């Protein structure tokens, strides 16, 4: 078996990636989230496949087909709630994974980091088109509001919106193409994830100390396979608790009402994992400005490798930047809260302050604190 896994053309790739991979001996549980994201992706593809067998992407039957899955299909309710809450678990793991990358300076591996940003954007697109499929009130109006933002693009905006809609409003053509996108995108995510791993294994993994770990590597299996298994079991435990005890806690009550183009919900808002970006969008009174801020709220992650002027790797020995980092996390939580609130005083003002703070921390405060810490080292 030992000879086979080292010489077989296919098993050799698996062996170099998951068995004999030299890994830093000190990586903590924060490094588990990559494998957890892989697990989430597998759960989403499997549950999504079974849901697609019973779902119909037609405006007249979409809502009923989801109800049919929950009522009449064997364990359909479980598959549906695992898929819906699996998306939330996916984004929790994704946010922690990105947060860990920022804290421990993983962005210096720029190819891996940039592929990660593409993965983040693709996952957000997949989740957005997936949220439209049940064809409830929030699905319909969410699709209308978010796709309508593209009309802010000068000259081609309106044409682009009608092209995406497949008509003059969100209708049957929109739902059908969103279902097609939702089906194909997870496989594109899988391909990007493999490229992400390929680039990571070119350089080797970062570690909590931020120091070179070439002199202290251990094989990935059995040490980190067992560690990842523990993380996977904990993830499955949380997911099952969510799906079985609190299946609708992260959903929107409006989505239990079938889509009605003649009746607008009181507060249109996306799923919780988009609220931070939605708050940034709403905090700018200008439509085009809001759309640009929305896109930049994710693309700003690409600035981390460019703005990195620190002589140290990661934040473990950098107390000033550590404080700024945790302010940044708190600010993100404030934005998430604001995104779910109505557009009125004082929420609009808090949202504007939090949005400015979000960009200021990344572009101004972190580079300044890096410079201060570099000078402290020289003392």
From Swiss-Prot:
Subunit note: The cytochrome bc1 complex contains 11 subunits: 3 respiratory subunits (MT-CYB, CYC1 and UQCRFS1), 2 core proteins (UQCRC1 and UQCRC2) and 6 low-molecular weight proteins (UQCRH/QCR6, UQCRB/QCR7, UQCRQ/QCR8, UQCR10/QCR9, UQCR11/QCR10 and a cleavage product of UQCRFS1). This cytochrome bc1 complex then forms a dimer.
Named cofactor requirement(s): heme b
Sequence positions that bind heme b b566: 97, 196
Cofactor note text: Binds 2 heme b groups non-covalently.
Gene: MT-CYB
Residues where heme b b562 binds: 83, 182
A GO CC term assigned to this protein in UniProt: respiratory chain complex III
Gene Ontology biological process terms from the UniProt entry: mitochondrial electron transport, ubiquinol to cytochrome c
Protein topology in the membrane: Multi-pass membrane protein
Sites where the protein binds a ubiquinone: 201
UniProt protein name: Cytochrome b
GO molecular function terms listed in the Swiss-Prot or TrEMBL record: metal ion binding; ubiquinol-cytochrome-c reductase activity
InterPro entries: Cyt_b/b6_C, Cyt_b/b6_C_sf, Cyt_b/b6_N, Cytb/b6-like_sf, Cytochrome_b, Cytochrome_b_C_euk/bac, Cytochrome_b_N_euk/bac, Di-haem_cyt_TM
